[in-house]
Structures are given as structure tokens and as C-alpha cells.
Amino acid sequence: YQKSSPGSNITT
């Protein structure tokens, strides 16, 4: 699952 946000990138 990958989620990209304007302030932070989170990869789990």
C-alpha cells in the first residue's frame, strides 16, 4: 500500500 501526500510520503 502506497500513499502520497503533499507534505509526506508513506510506504508500508
Curated annotation (Swiss-Prot):
Example of a GO cellular component annotation carried by this entry: extracellular region
Disulfide partners: none
Keyword Metal-binding among record annotations: no
BP GO terms, sorted: proteolysis
Record's keyword terms, sorted: Aspartyl protease, Hydrolase, Protease, Secreted
Entry keyword Protease: yes
Tissue specificity remark: Expressed in placenta, specifically the fetal cotyledonary tissue (FCT) (at protein level).
Localisation per UniProt entry: Secreted, Extracellular space
GO MF term list: aspartic-type endopeptidase activity
The family this protein is said to belong to: Belongs to the peptidase A1 family.
Name recorded for this polypeptide: Pregnancy-associated glycoprotein 62A
Organism for this UniProt entry: Dama dama (Fallow deer)
